[in-house]
Amino acid sequence: MIELTDEILAKVIKKRKKASYKGTYGRLLVIGGNRQYGGAAILVTTSAVYSGAGLVSVALAKENHSALQARLPEAMTLDFDDLIKLREVAKAADVIVIGPGLGLERLDLLTEVLNLLTENQKLVIDGSALTLFAREHLDLPFPENTVFTPHEMELERLSGLKIGQQTKEEVQDFVNQLGAIVVAKSSETRIFAPNRESFILKIGSPAQATGGMGDTLAGMVGGFLAQFHGETEEVVAAATYLHSLIASVLARKTYVVLPSRLIEEIPLFMKKYEC
C-alpha cells in the first residue's frame, strides 16, 4: 500500500486560472437530507461548497429547505420529491453525491439516479444509499465512475466481509470485482481502486469520531471530483487525505473536532497546497 503524504495535495489541487468562471469548477448535486436528517444534508453540501465546487444544488426534504438556505445561501435547493426538477438537475450535474441523511425508505431516489446516470458523470455513494445498494444487490451502470465511502460496518454489508476479514487482500479482491473506488474508512483509512495499488492514511485523530464527519468527507470527495480532472483515485485520495490532515491539525488544540469547524478550514488548506 502507498502511504499518502502532502504530495498528493500538491499534485491534485491546481491554482485557479484567471480566465475561469463558476462552471469551470463543476456542477454538483447532493441528494439526501430526509425529514429527520437535515443536518447531514447541510454538512455534505457545505463541505462541497467550501471545497470549491462551482455550482452546488441539493435535493432534500422540503421541511429542511429553510434551514439549509439560512446556513448556506450559496447552494440551490430543490424538493427531492419533485422528480421532474430532480431529473433536470441530475442530468446537468458533473457529480452526484447521494446518501447522507437519505433514509432507508428512499430506495426510489437511488434507483432513479442509477437509471439517469451517464458515462460522463461521477457518482459518490455514501450513508443510507450505500446500505440500500448493498441490501438490494443493485448494479452500477458505470462502476469506473463510482466512489463508495463506507465505514467498516457498511463495508461489511457491501462486501460480505466481516470487520476482522477486511484485510488488504480481501478488500482488494472485492473491489476488483465491484469495479468501483472504495474509501474504506477506519482509524487508518484505505482507498482501493480496481486492479491498482491501494493508498493508506497514517494521519487522522480519534477527535474525528463524531457525527457528521463522514458526511463532510463525502462532500469533499464530491467537490474535488467536480473541479479536478486527474486520475479519479488520486483526486479521491487527495480529498480524503486533506480531511484527515485538517482534523489532525485541529486536534492539537481541541478534544473533539466538529465537522462544521473542519469545513471552515478547507479553503485555507487548499490555498496552502495549490500548485
UniProtKB/Swiss-Prot annotation:
Its cofactor is Mg(2+). The keyword Ribosomal protein does not apply. One of its GO terms (molecular function) is NAD(P)HX epimerase activity. It catalyses: (6S)-NADHX + ADP = AMP + phosphate + NADH + H(+); (6S)-NADPHX + ADP = AMP + phosphate + NADPH + H(+). PROSITE patterns: YJEF_C_1, YJEF_C_2, YJEF_C_3. Its EC number is 4.2.1.136. Residues 5-273 form the YjeF C-terminal domain. AMP binds at G214. The keyword Lyase applies. Belongs to the NnrD/CARKD family. Homotetramer. This is ADP-dependent (S)-NAD(P)H-hydrate dehydratase. It comes from Lactococcus lactis subsp. lactis (strain IL1403). The lineage of its organism: Bacteria, Bacillati, Bacillota, Bacilli, Lactobacillales. The gene is nnrD.
